[in-house]
């Protein structure tokens, strides 16, 4: 079970809302979000309702302003609690759509896709075990995308506008 608290103002000030499960529309609870406290669990925050728009991965900790979670603005409109996973993590990445081209099987975090695999794009992937977060840039920076177990035949399937991937990591309650 997870627990996250959203605050309208920076520094954990202003009106707040506590949440312990997925919420497709947070607009009724607050108009803006400038700070967040994650008491337990790992969460994905979304800038628009129904889990749309920019995504932000947060784990246990305090985030006194939206820049701490690499936010582009104070707009958080939905959130999803990421299920805990205690087993192994496995994902296959492909250089082309529909699981074609060079394939690599992944079981751990990758700080730089370019350095490790000599790739800058992933066009399709298959998450076999665990949840992962893809980052647009190396060193876990840039736009973020939550990947749950399943097949992603093209980058549009995970919500990206292009195939550019710089890094990725397993969703774990500790780093």
Curated annotation (Swiss-Prot):
It holds the Pfam family Crystall. One of its GO terms (cellular component) is cytoplasm. Residues 2-40, 41-83, 89-129, 130-172 form the Beta/gamma crystallin 'Greek key' domain. InterPro entries: Beta/Gamma-Crystallin, Beta/gamma_crystallin, G_crystallin-like. GO terms for molecular function: structural constituent of eye lens. It comes from the Eukaryota. GO terms for biological process: eye development; lens development in camera-type eye; lens fiber cell development; lens fiber cell morphogenesis; visual perception. Belongs to the beta/gamma-crystallin family. Crystallins are the dominant structural components of the vertebrate eye lens. There are six different gamma crystallins identified in rat lens. Has a two-domain beta-structure, folded into four very similar Greek key motifs. This is Gamma-crystallin B. It comes from Rattus norvegicus (Rat). The gene is Crygb.
